[in-house]
């Protein structure tokens, strides 16, 4: 009897252990299940920063790398960073990201790193789904290959729509007073679902490393900015 009881106990323990480690289905995100990748997939290598990638834990630890917050890098540093890859990048875009980022309480300096990934250093070439004339800096509305995505009348409107989509993910509050809703997919997002940039992985883009890519690029921006001070 004791042997049978011991065997039963072991089997019961194994059963509950298996249940505790079983994978659980994630909550459905109505804005993130589409089979598409960032509009720009070419590696974003620095021309003279071999082995210069900073650990994510140094400047953007996963649990602390929040979408909401104040920008830490100025427009001049951002522009100098981008000009090394695209001399034609308009400084106005960086300034608008920081200005509107303050309005929405979003890290505009990180949002523009996401835009770099989506637009290929704002060149809109080599595979980006959106084009320069669309003023779409985040692949907004590109739900699958062949879909052109949303277009906006001005640079400011395009940046505003990008930040509004981030705001939808990171906050449950109403838009700031006086801000017109320009994001055509704002209502499709489960509000407050993503608090960190890493939470955008498999949501904003069906790419498990999407948040890491944003963080890595931001880390490189931080390193570049620090080296030029």
Regions from the PLM with identified roles:
Residues 8-16:
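Bacterial N-terminal signal peptides
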Residues 2-6, 18-229:
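Catalytic cores of secreted/periplasmic lytic hydrolases that degrade extracellular macromolecules
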């Amino acid at each position: 009897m004791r042997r049978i009881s011991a065997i039963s106990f072991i089997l019961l323990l194994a059963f509950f252990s298996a249940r505790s480690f079983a994978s659980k289905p994630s909550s459905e995100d109505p804005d993130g299940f589409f089979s598409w990748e960032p509009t720009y997939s070419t590696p974003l290598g620095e021309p003279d920063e071999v082995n210069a990638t900073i650990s994510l834990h140094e400047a953007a630890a996963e649990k602390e790398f929040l979408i909401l917050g104040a920008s830490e890098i100025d427009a001049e540093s951002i522009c100098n960073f981008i000009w090394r890859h695209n001399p034609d990048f308009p400084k106005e875009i960086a300034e608008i990201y920081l200005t509107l980022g303050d309005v929405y309480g979003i890290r505009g300096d990180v949002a523009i790193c996401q835009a770099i990934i989506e637009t290929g250093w704002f060149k809109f070439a080599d595979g980006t789904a959106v084009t320069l004339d669309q003023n779409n800096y985040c692949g907004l509305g590109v739900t699958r290959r062949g879909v052109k995505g949303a277009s906006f009348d001005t640079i400011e409107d395009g940046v505003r729509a990008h930040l509004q989509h981030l705001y939808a993910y990171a906050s449950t509050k109403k838009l700031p007073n006086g801000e017109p809703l320009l994001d055509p997919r704002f209502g499709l997002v489960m509000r407050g679902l993503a608090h960190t940039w890493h939470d955008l992985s498999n949501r904003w883009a069906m790419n498990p490393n999407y948040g890491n890519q944003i963080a890595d690029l931001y880390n490189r921006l931080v390193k570049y900015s620090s080296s030029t001070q």
